Amino acid sequence: MRTALLEVGLEELPASEFHSILKQLEERSTELLKAYRISSGSAEVFVGSRRFGVILKNLPERQEDFTEEKKGPPLNVAYDENGKPTKALEGFLRNNNASLENVVHREGYIYLSRVVEGKPVEEVLPDLFRDLVLGLNFRKPMRWGSGEHEYIRPVHWIVAMVDGRVLDLEIFGLRSSRISYGKRYHAGSIKIPDPERYYESLKKGFVISSHLERKKFVLEQIDEFEKRSGMKIERDEELIEEIVAITEYPRIVVGQFDRKYLELPEEIIVTAVKHHQRSFIAHKETLTNTFVAFQDGPQPPENVVKGYERVINARLEDARYYFQKDLETPLEKMNEKLKEIVFQEKLGTLYDKVERIKKISERLCEDLKLPESFTQKVLEAASICKADIASKVVYEFPELQGVMGRIYALREGINEEIATAIEDHYSEEPQTVIGSILGIADRIDTIVGNFAIGNVPTSSKDPYGLKNKADAIFRIIRKNEWDISLEELLTFASSLVGYRLSEELETFFAGRFYQFLVNELGISFDVARAVNHLWKRPLRGILSAEALQEISEKPEFQDLFVGFERVHNITKNHDSVRFDGALFEKEEEKKLMNKFYEVKEKVLKALERLNYREALQYLIELKPYIDEYFDNVFVMVKRDDLRVNRLGFLKNIDELFMMVGDMTYLVKRSQV
C-alpha cells in the first residue's frame, strides 16, 4: 500500500479558525477519497499555526474500476425492422468509442455499459489535493500579491508527495516540491524524503505538525512542572486548545509576578493572566504568584521569562489601580452611569434596559406567585444587575461582567443572595432563583428588542446570539419547573419597547423550542413536532414531549394515535366547539359524549397537576368509543344542523387531545 502527503505552508493562521480547518480537512478528505474511488485509503490530518495538510495511508496502486453507463437512442430508432443497427446507433457507438458488445437494452432505450479502469493513484492525487485545498471555507479570506488569489492567509509553499515521489501539483501559482520549512528564526528549509518520515523530519526543525502530538507535549510539560514544583495547574481545556492552535513547538515558561497582586480577587488575577497572556496560574492550597506560559520555539532564554513577568506585572498593576478606583464608587452610582452607555441605538441606554429588566422580572414574580418580600429581593438585584458594566475593571476585562458586580456588591455589604444573582443571571444555567428570574427577563428583553428594530436572526447569521438566548430561556424554565406563559411574557416585554408580539417572533420561539426538544432533551423529531404548538407554555410542552416519547412506542397507544387522526382530520377546517347533545340521533353519539365528559374531567385534573402520563392514560379510554362512533355515524351529512353539530362535538375531542399533543405526527410512526 502507498502513502501520500499534502502540506500547505502559510502565514500565521488565526487561532479562531483552527477547529474549523481541522474539521473541514477531516470531512473533505474522507469525502474525496470516496469520490476519487480510493475507498481503501484513510486520512490523518494535521493543523499548525503555519501549516495544515493530510497524510493519506493505505492507498492502492490504482483507483477502483467503475461501470460507466450512458443513455442512447430509443430501441425503435436504434434498429431497423430487420433488427439491424441503424445509422443512429452506429453514430452513437462511434461518438463514444464503443461497440455493440457494450450495448444493453433497458426501458425501451439503448444504454452503453462498460467497465472503466481506474487510473494510477499518482495521476489522480494532484486533482484530489487541489480539490481539498480549494474546497475549504473561511470566515474572512484575504487576497495577497496581485490580488488574484483569495485564501485564509497567503500561501508560501506546497509539499505534495506519494511515497518518495513529488506529485505534479500547482496551486496559487506555486508548484509542489519536497521542501518544507521549520520554525521561523530557528530552522530553515527541510527536505522531506517521504510521507512516512514527514513528522520526524519537521521535528528536527522545531515543528510538531500533529496537533495531537502538540497537545500531548503541552500536557507532559505541565505534568513535569507539577512533579518538580509540588504545585497544581488547572487543566483549562479552552486555554490548552488555544496554545496548541497558536504554537508549532510549545515550550514551557515558568515565571512569577509580584506577590502584592495576590491581594486582588482571584477572578481578576486569573483573567489578566489567562485571557490576556494565555498563561496558567499555579495553585497550592490557594492561588500562588507562579504562572506557566508556553513559548513557541526551542527552550526559551532567560529574557523571555523576564518579558512574560514584566508584561503580567504591568497588567496586574493596571487591574489593581482600576479595582481600587472602582471601590470608591458604589454600585448605585455605577448604575447611574449606565445612562451614558448605549445598549443599542434604537433601544436606548443600558439604564433603560435595566428598567425594562426590572419590569419583566416583577411580572415574572407575579406569574410565579412569589411572596412580596422575595419579589423585593429580585427587584433590588435587577436594579444593579448591569451596574458593573460602568466599572473600570469590566471596561478593561469585559469577561468579568457580572463577576465584578458580585464582588462589589459583597464589598458593600449587600445581601449575598442578591450579590450572587448579579453574576448568576448571565449563566446559561443559573443556580439561584433570583438569577434565573433575571436571566429570563434579560434575555427576553434582548430578543424582543432586537426583533422590534429588525435585527432578526437567519439560518446563517445570528450576530446578537438570540438563538442561544432563547434556548437558555427554555433551559431555565425546565430546570426550575416553572409553569409560566412565555407568550404573555413576550407580549408584556414587547409593550415596553413599543412593539406588538409578531408572528415572526412567535415563529422564532416555536422553532427554537423544537430545536431545544430535539437537540438538548433528545426528543424524537415526530414527538417534537407533535408538541411544538405548546411552546407558549414551555414546561407543559416539555412534560408532554417526555410523556409522549415514553409511551409512543407502546402498541396500545398506536391505535389511540390513529383514532385521534380521524377526529383531527375531519375537524381541522371547523373552528367552533358548539354542539347540542339533544340533536344526537345515534346511540354511539351519546355514548361517546358521556365518555368524553368523564374523560375530560379526569384529563384536566391530571394536566392541572402537570401529569401528562396520567392524562394520556385517560385519553386512551376514548379509543373504542371513537372507533364505534365512526363505524356507525356519518358526520358529513347533508343536513347542515346535524353536520355542524357533529363537527362541533368532535372539535371538543380534538382540542382535548391537542392539549397533550398533535398526535397526527405520531400516526406515521405507527404505520412504518
UniProtKB/Swiss-Prot annotation:
Cell location: Cytoplasm
Keywords: Aminoacyl-tRNA synthetase, ATP-binding, Cytoplasm, Ligase, Nucleotide-binding, Protein biosynthesis
InterPro entries linked to this entry: DALR_anticod-bd, Gly-tRNA-synth_bsu, Gly-tRNA-synth_heterodimer, tRNAsynth_Ia_anticodon-bd
Record-listed E.C. numbers: 6.1.1.14
GO terms of biological process kind: arginyl-tRNA aminoacylation; glycyl-tRNA aminoacylation
Main localization of the protein described in the UniProt heading: cytoplasm
Gene Ontology MF annotations: arginine-tRNA ligase activity; ATP binding; glycine-tRNA ligase activity
GO cellular component: cytosol
Reaction it catalyzes: tRNA(Gly) + glycine + ATP = glycyl-tRNA(Gly) + AMP + diphosphate
Pfam family, one: tRNA_synt_2f
Subunit structure: Tetramer of two alpha and two beta subunits.
Family, as annotated: Belongs to the class-II aminoacyl-tRNA synthetase family.
UniProt name for this protein: Glycine--tRNA ligase beta subunit
Organism: Thermotoga petrophila (strain ATCC BAA-488 / DSM 13995 / JCM 10881 / RKU-1)
